[in-house]
Structures are given as structure tokens and as C-alpha cells.
Amino acid sequence: MKITKANGVVEYQLLAQLKQRAGETDPKITEAVTTIINGVKEGGDEAVREYTVRFDGSVPKKIEFDKDEIHAFLDQVDPAFKDAVVKAQQNIYDFHQRQAQQSWMTTKESGVIMGQRIRGLKRVGIYVPGGTAAYPSSVLMNAVPAKIAGVQEIIMVTPPGKDGNPNPNIMAAAAVAGVDKVYLVGGAQAVAALAYGTQRIPKVDKIVGPGNIFVATAKKLLYGVVDIDMVAGPSEILIVADSTADASFLAADLMSQAEHDMRASAILLTTSESLAKNTLREIDRQIKTLVRQEIIQKSFDDYGEIIVCDNLRQALDFANELAPEHLELCVAEPLKYIGMVDNAGSVFLGNWSPEPLGDYYAGPNHVLPTSGTARFFSPLSVDSFVKKSSFIYYTPEELKKAKDDIMLLAETEGLTAHANSIKVRFE
């Protein structure tokens, strides 16, 4: 990781590099995933089994777990872990329940009735990685808002461990979050099974949750067959800091995201050159104590940078251009600047609100737009799991008042059958 001075060029060269990373695709992976999807579409459970044997070496003896069996895993985990999951679930629930919307209806004096009906999706599938990349927090972040939205059935798919059993921590989180069924299957074949349905695995309306490049590609290819949350790219953190920030905190926060993936980006924008140098020294000191230091170092080498800016306005302008997944404002008066942030997945205010707080515990969702898509996408929310229908009721008298306007608009567009639909009612 190097230190550079913002000059209107160097920072935007970095932006171009990150945009190029976001657009990279591997045709071989796309081809392989397409084959898997078509295989599952045609072959159902047997195809899922064949792909599981091919990629994982074997098929677990028990594949399906109902609600009672899921809840049994609460007795298999560390009580302290269980307690932490329950507390996190409560925080996530408290935040997301404020997002819930109600159906509404309005009746005018004329007798016209209009409104919007809001209800949860029928069935949602959650993909949760297993093995070394097992994330119980992902279960909570995906299942809790779905539950609040009124989703009728929440299905979770997760690959088994090497022993053929599910990860107990993931299953315990599923119990706390209210997951209805779990199927021990992973990879692109699991995503395809959720999208099309098999003899055993039911078809869902939406697929959410993180996964490797094969899972992400499958979700992207199946969008339209089912809805998806988003196509997630590598993790990102951008920190804007002034001279009041703590270099040891900044170094730790940058590394907390860089450890996710060699393609993760970790960028610090600061108005203090001395803070930039101290942060670099802190990285060198702290990285030696971390398990994933090789991943962190590769991420820093390829997609990490410390940029010294003239002022916070310049830093925030660049932040809005980058539209990062995670944005930390480690400045003296962070609330003063929140109104200047237009594009960010989640914003962490001050020196005592580090990004991992949002990943696990605070309440806001950690499923966030990446690769600059925070310009137009939003975090996963209760709204992600509902559908809305509008309804209209007109009386004969009110339609008669509007008929000439409607017919004129339809005829102007050349849609005479539309106009006729109104006309015949008054002949």
C-alpha cells in the first residue's frame, strides 16, 4: 500500500482501476455454471446429487432438516455464541421492523377507491456458505428482514462440512432467525435447485445470500427466473479521516475488509499527511499478528491506497464518485458531514463505530451494494422481501367524467383498442 497526494488525476486512476475490476468476468466460469443450471433444470435431484459428488466428493446422508431439527442445534453450540447471536438478532430485528410498510387505501368523496396492497413473498431461498467461510451473521441479516416482511417460508441451503454434517453455528443462527427448512447442498447447483425447484427442494421466489464466484454467477444468470438480492462484488471499505483520527484504528479497519478477499479494496482518504504515515506504520505492525495476512497484503498491493487530500470536501467528493460498500467518517464532527454523503452502502460515524460493528451487531443490514452500485442500489431490507399491487375502483359516473381524456390519450398513442375499451361502456 502506498501514500499518494490527491491531484484530480491519481485518485480517479484508482477509481478507473476499481471499475475495471468490477467488470471482469470469466467466460469459462459462466459456461460451467450455465451447464450446471441446465443440468439441474432437466435432471432435478439426481443432477444436484451428481454435481455434489463431482465437486464435494460425496453426498451427506441427511440432506433435509425441518424446523425442530434446526432448533436442536441450539444445544450443540457454545452458550456464549448462542447469547451473542440472540442479541444480534434482536438488534437486527429492532432496526428492520421500522422499515415495514402497511397496505393502504384511500376513498374520495366521488366514490373512487384506490390503494396499494403490500405482502411478503411466498417463499425465499437463502444461500449461506459453509466450511471455512461459514458466516452465521449472513443467516441473520437475510432471514430477519424476510421474517418481518411476512415471507411465508424461508428455505436455507448450505454446503455440508467435510464430515457430511451442517455447521452447527450456522444452524443455530438459522434457528434464532426463524428459518423453516435447511437443505445441505451448495454451489451453483443449489442456486439452480432453488430457482427451478426439484423433487425435494421447493422452488422459491427470490434467492439471497453470499457465495463464491460460481454462486454469484448462478444468481446473475438466473435473475428473471427468480428475483435475487444483488450481484455482490469484492468487499470494499473507504475511510475518510481528519487529524483527530487514531492511526491504529484506521489500520485495523482497513485490514478488517482486506482479509475478506485478495480482490477487496481498502482505501484511506485523509487531510493529514502525518496520519497517513502513521497508519502505514500501524498496518506493518498489526498485520504480523493476523491469520490472513497474505490475503490482506495482496489486497493492499492491488487495490489498497492512502490518499492525502487538501480538505474533507475533496475527500467526500471522491467518496461519492466511488460509492463504496462501507464508508467510515473518522472525523471530529461526523454527524456534520452525513448530509454530504450521497453514495454509500452503509456509513459508520466516528472513531467508535467500526465497520465490523455493522457486520455483526448494530442492526442495519450488512448485505450492501458493491462495485459502485451504491449510486442506485440500496442495502437489503424488509422492502426486498415484499411485493406491492395497486388497485383501482371507479364508479360509472366517475369513469364517464374521465372518458374523453382517456380516449384522447389512447388515440394519441395509436392504441385504438384501449380507447374502444372506454367507448363501449357508454354506447
PLM regions with names:
Residues M1-K122:
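N-terminal Rossmann-like NAD(P)+-binding subdomain of aldehyde/semialdehyde dehydrogenases
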Residues K2-G8, K181-G186, I306-N311:
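Short acidic-hydrophobic, aromatic-tinged amphipathic segments that line or gate anion-handling sites
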Residues T106-A172:
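Conserved small-residue-rich beta-alpha loop and adjacent elements
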Residues M141-Q152, A175-A177, A195-I201, K219-L221, ...:
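Alpha-helix C-terminal capping segments
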Residues G178-S248, D253-S256, H260-S265:
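Conserved NAD(P)+-binding/catalytic subdomain of aldehyde/semialdehyde dehydrogenases
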Residues V208-P210, M230-A241, Q257-L280, I296-I307, ...:
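Short loop-to-beta-strand entry elements in the cores of soluble alpha/beta enzymes
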Residues E321-E427:
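C-terminal core of ALDH-fold dehydrogenases
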